[in-house]
Amino acid sequence: MRIIEGNLVGTGLKIGIVVSRFNEFITGKLLSGAIDGLTRHGVSDSDITVAWVPGAFEIPLVAKKMAESKQFDAVITLGAVIRGATSHFDYVCSEAAKGVSHAALASGVPVIFGVLTTDTIEQAIERAGTKAGNKGWEAAVSAIEMANVLRTLA
């Protein structure tokens, strides 16, 4: 039996990160967590490219362009969508998730969904480096693992 698993060694990997400026007090912490996770696993600062976009709805297009460029072994998407009083939250979350998934499937490059979708600001803060860890860091580790899984399959 052959088992395929990705390791968590990031040396030599080139990583793109798309991060939304909306709710930057949260997304900035996710970005810091992602960069920390990447560099602790061997990814060089010079191999990380960060693209800022206005909001979560804009993330998929830039993620797809980065993935299709074949300059990156993986792309991480970071955002924070916090529920408000209207249905806008549902549309943005749904389209962001679908778009990120499409970017990965269309390009063949791992595109990691690190967009927080929370009911409250407190939940977002918890997931950006306090009680619930840092989801940016977790997305970075997922990106490394998936890039290495795909290298094994190549």
Swiss-Prot record:
Its EC number is 2.5.1.78. 5-amino-6-(D-ribitylamino)uracil binds at residues 22, 56-58, 80-82, 113. GO terms for biological process: riboflavin biosynthetic process. Keywords: Riboflavin biosynthesis, Transferase. It is an enzyme of class 2 (transferase). It comes from the Bacteria. GO terms for molecular function: 6,7-dimethyl-8-ribityllumazine synthase activity. GO terms for cellular component: cytosol; riboflavin synthase complex. The active site is at residue 88. Forms an icosahedral capsid composed of 60 subunits, arranged as a dodecamer of pentamers. Belongs to the DMRL synthase family. Catalyzes the formation of 6,7-dimethyl-8-ribityllumazine by condensation of 5-amino-6-(D-ribitylamino)uracil with 3,4-dihydroxy-2-butanone 4-phosphate. This is the penultimate step in the biosynthesis of riboflavin. This is 6,7-dimethyl-8-ribityllumazine synthase. It comes from Geobacillus kaustophilus (strain HTA426). The lineage of its organism: Bacteria, Bacillati, Bacillota, Bacilli, Bacillales. The gene is ribH.
